[in-house]
């Protein structure tokens, strides 16, 4: 049975692939964007991420709300993931599911250590790590149906299915990247299969 999905951040590297992979599976996809056109054949709603009233009205009637927003300027400390995530977590109803794309720093390296706390983490990603952590620590305690998707460095590339996923932990792999298409593939499959709730999933190319 197909799901009704709305994607925030649909014009970005991952957002486009999330839309693409969900369309492949026959889900009904809408996007909330600033632009007035979109390359895929989807319903689109034009609006700003700061417009709480419009977003509250827009997400009504969807089964799944996906946030793939992010700050594309790594040097800019302005948080994007956290404020949008916190807003959506406040607005969704009890029968809706919220899927948020964060980063692999939210996953565990071992029983005691988060990946974000390991030595040698890239300095240029410190703002992103802070943004993701702010989102996770505010949303994880809530009594809502959420799921954090935690990929390592996302690069251009369509889905090939050759990736690893693990709940709570970062999967062991020699790879240091993941194709945006594989992130989209996992999210689309999870929307159909509905295996995980109130948790986080690490992703990396195999």
Which residue stretches match the model-derived regions?
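N-terminal Rossmann NAD(P)H-binding glycine-rich loop of SDR-like oxidoreductase domains
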Residues: 5-25
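Conserved Rossmann-fold NAD(P)-dependent oxidoreductase catalytic core, especially the SDR/UDP-sugar
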Residues: 30, 86-127, 141, 147
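NAD(P)H-binding glycine-rich loop region in Rossmannoid oxidoreductase-like domains
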Residues: 37-94
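Conserved catalytic-site region of short-chain dehydrogenase/reductase
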Residues: 74, 105-110, 154-158
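Conserved beta-loop-beta element that borders a ligand/cofactor-binding pocket
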Residues: 136-158
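Core catalytic loop region at the nicotinamide-binding pocket of NAD(P)H-dependent oxidoreductases
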Residues: 146, 193-206
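Glycine/proline-rich active-site loop of Rossmann-fold NAD(P)-dependent oxidoreductases
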Residues: 158-164, 190-199
């Amino acid at each position: 049975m197909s799901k009704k999905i709305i994607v925030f951040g649909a014009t970005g590297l991952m957002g486009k692939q999330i839309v693409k992979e969900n369309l492949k599976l026959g889900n009904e996809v809408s996007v909330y964007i600033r632009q007035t056109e979109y390359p895929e054949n989807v319903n689109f709603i034009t609006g700003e991420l700061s417009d709480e009233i419009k977003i509250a009205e827009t997400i009504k009637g969807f089964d799944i709300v996906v946030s793939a927003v992010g700050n594309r300027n790594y040097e800019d400390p302005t948080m994007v993931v956290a404020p949008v995530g916190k807003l959506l977590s406040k607005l969704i109803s009890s029968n809706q599911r919220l899927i948020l794309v964060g980063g692999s720093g939210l996953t565990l390296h071992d029983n005691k250590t988060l990946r974000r706390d390991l030595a040698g983490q890239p300095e240029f990603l410190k703002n992103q790590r802070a943004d993701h952590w702010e989102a996770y620590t505010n949303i994880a305690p809530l009594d809502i149906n959420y799921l954090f998707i935690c990929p390592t460095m996302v690069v251009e590339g369509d889905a090939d299915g050759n990736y690893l996923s693990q709940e709570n932990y970062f999967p062991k792999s020699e790879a240091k990247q993941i194709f945006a298409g594989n992130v989209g593939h996992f999210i689309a499959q999870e929307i159909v299969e509905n295996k995980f709730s109130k948790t986080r999933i690490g992703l990396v190319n195999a």
